[in-house]
Amino acid sequence: MIDLYTWATPNGRKVSIILEELGLDYNVHEINIAKGEQHTPEFLTVSPNNKIPSIVDSDGPGGPGGKPLSMFETGAILIYLAEKTESELYPKDFKKRMATLQWLMWQMGGVGPMFGQAHHFMFNPSEVVPYAQERYHKEAKRLYKVMNTQMQDNCYLAGDDYTVADIATFPWVDRFRRHQVDLTEFPNVKRWHEELWERPAVKKGMEVPFYNQ
């Protein structure tokens, strides 16, 4: 059994999506970051960086009978869960795996931080900072363009197969309105976004942590 410590953010929903895709049993523990619950001593024991999401796998890395394993950082969690279950969401073929890793790191190092800043400065900001709004809006649109170009000849980010790179990126792109982005400008991204929304695991994962209330 996996315990998922999460909240309704793009990062949190990456992990609930992959758990649904893999059909793994999991318990949801809501960590209300608006109330600062990520800073409690209890949460610190499972996430040393005081960030959601994190998981505790009571079956451990070797399957049933192993020691409980705590993990934080979404990229690491996605790879761990895919490898634990021997899923092709993180391909076994070396070239495909490296392509997946490359685009996963692109999300972790670019999309997440830049879209996060776009959210902060453009979506109901407590203070309007025009320079920051222009900078992060411009960078967000650049990243959408990168995605659009990549998927001109590919069904998904890392090629023709759905992978952890798509799972990691989707919840951020789903907030495109907060970036003041019109997806019709990026038709390949729009097609990809609509297609992923049709996946049952994505629909269910995007409702966590509230769907089970």
Where do the PLM segments sit?
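Conserved beta-strand edge residues that scaffold enzyme active sites
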Residues: 33-34, 165, 210-211
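Terminal-tail/helix-coil boundary detector
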Residues: 202-213
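GST-like domain detector, emphasizing the conserved glutathione-binding G-site
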Residues: 1-134
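A local structural micro-motif
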Residues: 27, 90, 159, 184, ...
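Phosphate-coordinating loops and pocket residues in cytosolic domains that bind phosphorylated ligands
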Residues: 45, 91, 169, 198, ...
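GST-like fold's C-terminal all-alpha helical module
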Residues: 81, 107-200
